[in-house]
């Protein structure tokens, strides 16, 4: 008998040690997730606050709003749930309802800001001239205000009035505990059917439908522009070859042009796929479960609910993890990368960022291709004679307001346009990105007129 008690005691000790190790690992992982979310979104906020050329771009208003919502997720939502996961109970008492409201508000604000960004990018690409006239800071602030107001309305009002709680068998009941018998250290976040469906529609399903439509149309516009540019490239190469009596290479260059066009389209598709794929993979499982849980009914033949609490919690964290990835996807273009490197002091360690950089200008005034250069001036730099010359450009100019003319994007720079030279050429911004493995971004695709010329944008 004593041996049996000893065996039972050893078994309990092993279970306690295993549970303790599991909690330590969970705590380390969740702490790392919270830290990366805080770091990434704080860097975005500080960069926009510190550098005026980032504040001056209206499209960055939406990025900073997204960063603020994700920062609030990391401050007001994630730490409290992480403490509960580690301790095994809710230690914050009456703060439960406020925390639930913060959870719904911050997560909804993050998703709605992603939706607003997709609409902004689509408007900028589909109607660039109207966008330049209409998209003022006031309009941007109005769009952001609508997103935040909607987030507050579907969170604090229903939660504080207890409209969100299930009146029948709740998720907690399905796990073997009835709402009336809940201990004070348990935070019941179960939702009733009406609120679960309506809030999921506003917070996720409608925004994700809008994002799918806008990004699909963005891809089609980009595809059309890329094919037009490819046709202009082939026409220019054909004219040059006829002029130089090198017609034998036409077929080879035509095949190369088709391959380049396909490569460009593939990179655009990859960029948009990453944007939508990360968002859907993080949030879709949670919102499917969020709509299923209120319809789960207790089964008399088994003690298990249709969805376990562990499964539900895992996908809750999947959704919050999206807040740590958003800064990488939406604020990792060239402008933000330079700002981040300055804030973190990395620009002093990077060998490519010298104090003075030499940029060669050919006899047409356009910059010569040089992959080692971190800064390439626009083609408006004045010509000096008929020979190529070198301009000495201080590296500090990269951080000044003259850089406002550089294009913004999702994860790199892509500017689809033409440079008027001796003949029509693809701009270095395209060839520099598409020929390398750098990420492709879509912010502005300049429209092509009927005669094949790109219109210039006026501020």
Swiss-Prot record:
Gene Ontology CC annotations of this record: ciliary membrane; synapse
Parts of the chain that traverse the membrane: 24-49, 61-87, 97-119, 139-164, 192-216, 270-297, 312-333
Extracellular side stretches: 1-23, 88-96, 165-191, 298-311
Keywords assigned: Cell membrane, Cell projection, Disulfide bond, G-protein coupled receptor, Glycoprotein, Membrane, Receptor, Transducer, Transmembrane, Transmembrane helix
Record-linked Gene3D superfamilies: Rhodopsin 7-helix transmembrane proteins
Disulfide pairings: 96-187
Pfam family of the protein (one): 7tm_1
Compartments (UniProt record): Cell membrane; Cell projection, Cilium membrane
Glycosylated residues, chain numbering: 4
Topology, Cytoplasmic side: 50-60, 120-138, 217-269, 334-459
Keyword match Cell membrane: yes
InterPro entries documented for this protein: Dopamine_D1_rcpt, Dopamine_rcpt, GPCR_Rhodpsn, GPCR_Rhodpsn_7TM
Membrane topology designation: Multi-pass membrane protein
Gene Ontology molecular function: dopamine neurotransmitter receptor activity, coupled via Gs; G protein-coupled receptor activity
Gene Ontology biological process terms from the UniProt entry: adenylate cyclase-activating adrenergic receptor signaling pathway; positive regulation of MAPK cascade; vasodilation
Family affiliation: Belongs to the G-protein coupled receptor 1 family.
Annotated function: Receptor for dopamine.
Protein name: D(1)-like dopamine receptor
Phylogenetic lineage: Eukaryota, Metazoa, Chordata, Craniata, Vertebrata
Gene: d14
């Amino acid at each position: 008998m004593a041996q049996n008690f000893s065996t039972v005691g050893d078994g309990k000790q092993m279970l306690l040690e295993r549970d303790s190790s599991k909690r330590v690992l969970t705590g380390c992982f969740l702490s790392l997730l919270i830290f990366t979310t805080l770091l990434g979104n704080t860097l975005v906020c500080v960069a926009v606050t510190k550098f005026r050329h980032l504040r001056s771009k209206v499209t960055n208003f939406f990025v900073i709003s997204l960063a603020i919502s994700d920062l609030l997720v990391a401050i007001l939502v994630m730490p409290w749930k992480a403490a509960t996961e580690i301790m095994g109970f809710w230690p914050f008492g009456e703060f439960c309802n406020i925390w639930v409201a913060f959870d719904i508000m911050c997560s909804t604000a993050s998703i709605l800001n992603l939706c607003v960004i997709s609409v902004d990018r689509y408007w900028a690409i589909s109607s660039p001239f109207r966008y330049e006239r209409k998209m003022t800071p006031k309009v941007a602030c109005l769009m952001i205000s609508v997103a935040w107001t909607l987030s507050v309305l579907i969170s604090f009002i229903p939660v504080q009035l207890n409209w969100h709680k299930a009146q029948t068998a709740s998720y907690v009941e399905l796990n073997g505990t009835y709402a009336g018998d809940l201990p004070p250290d348990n935070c019941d976040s179960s939702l009733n059917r009406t609120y679960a469906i309506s809030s999921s529609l506003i917070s996720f399903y409608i925004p994700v439908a809008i994002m799918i439509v806008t990004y699909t149309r963005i891809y089609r516009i980009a595809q059309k522009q890329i094919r037009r540019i490819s046709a202009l490239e082939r026409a220019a190469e054909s004219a040059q070859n006829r002029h130089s009596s090198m017609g034998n290479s036409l077929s080879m260059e035509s095949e190369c042009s088709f391959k380049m066009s396909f490569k460009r389209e593939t990179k655009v598709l990859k960029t948009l796929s990453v944007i939508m794929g990360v968002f859907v993979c993080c949030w879709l499982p949670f919102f499917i479960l969020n709509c299923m849980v209120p319809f789960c009914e207790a089964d008399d033949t088994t003690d298990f609910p249709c969805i376990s609490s562990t499964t539900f919690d895992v996908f809750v964290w999947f959704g919050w993890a999206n807040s740590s990835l958003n800064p990488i996807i939406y604020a990792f273009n060239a402008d933000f990368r330079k700002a981040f490197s300055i804030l973190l002091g990395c620009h002093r360690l990077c060998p490519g960022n010298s104090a003075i950089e030499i940029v060669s200008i050919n006899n047409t005034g356009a910059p010569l291709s040089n992959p080692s250069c971190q800064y390439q001036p626009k083609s408006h730099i004045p010509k000096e004679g008929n020979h190529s010359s070198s301009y000495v450009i201080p590296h500090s100019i990269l951080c000044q307001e003259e850089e406002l003319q550089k294009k913004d994007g999702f994860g790199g720079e892509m500017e689809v346009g033409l440079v008027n030279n001796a003949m029509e050429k693809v701009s270095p911004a395209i060839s520099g990105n598409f020929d390398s493995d750098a990420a492709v971004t879509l912010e502005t695709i300049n429209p092509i007129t009927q005669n094949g010329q790109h219109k210039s944008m006026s501020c």
